[in-house]
């Protein structure tokens, strides 16, 4: 399924101005910067049980609240900082999600130390090359794959939280490890075929 807006054919989930901008500029674009990868990992975890539109609306607030997703700073958050975040109505005030952000920052730094970068680590799950799918409709797109299962298992082993396979697959889609734009979407070809 696709949606048309200004004669461009898009994936059908891009329905409002915010999601259209995200779809057209970010979703599925191969991402290699560690801070950007960390941002998406945290946002995908925050989205668990909520709509992605909710997270997109709060994204700027998350950047401000979480020191622009600087993992070194977040890894040093203490109980008082977590309490402060729990009182911040501009973000999702879920104690487990906020605590996992701190834990994920610590685990992220360890991965950077071990692999040289989080980018080098995370792209190994697709053999360092974007996987390009050929879906004709959103109904065909899976919620998880063997690659997201493997990523989830390894991230959990390394101490990350809120990284179930479905969250990992959404992360893979967001940062372009996979191109899951439907084939009729103008972004499918614009991003490339791997």
Name each model feature, range by range:
Residues 1-194:
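HhH-family (HhH-GPD) DNA N-glycosylase catalytic core used in base-excision repair
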């Amino acid at each position: 399924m696709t949606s048309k807006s200004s004669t461009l054919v898009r994936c059908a989930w891009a329905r409002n101005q915010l999601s259209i901008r995200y779809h057209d500029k970010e979703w599925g674009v191969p991402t290699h910067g560690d801070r950007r990868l960390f941002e998406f990992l945290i946002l995908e975890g925050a989205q668990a049980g909520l709509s992605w539109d909710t997270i997109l609306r709060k994204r700027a607030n998350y950047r401000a609240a979480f020191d622009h997703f600087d993992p070194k700073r977040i890894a040093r958050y203490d109980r008082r900082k977590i309490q402060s975040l729990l009182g911040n109505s501009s973000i999702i005030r879920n104690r487990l999600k906020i605590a996992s952000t701190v834990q994920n920052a610590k685990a992220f730094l360890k991965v950077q130390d071990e692999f040289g970068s989080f980018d080098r680590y995370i792209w190994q799950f697709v053999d360092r090359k974007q996987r390009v799918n050929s879906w004709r409709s959103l109904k065909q797109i899976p919620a998880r794959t063997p690659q997201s299962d493997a990523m989830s298992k390894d991230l959990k082993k390394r101490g990350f939280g809120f990284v179930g396979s479905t969250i990992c697959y959404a992360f893979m889609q967001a940062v372009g490890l996979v191109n899951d734009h439907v084939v009729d979407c103008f972004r499918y070809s614009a991003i490339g075929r791997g």
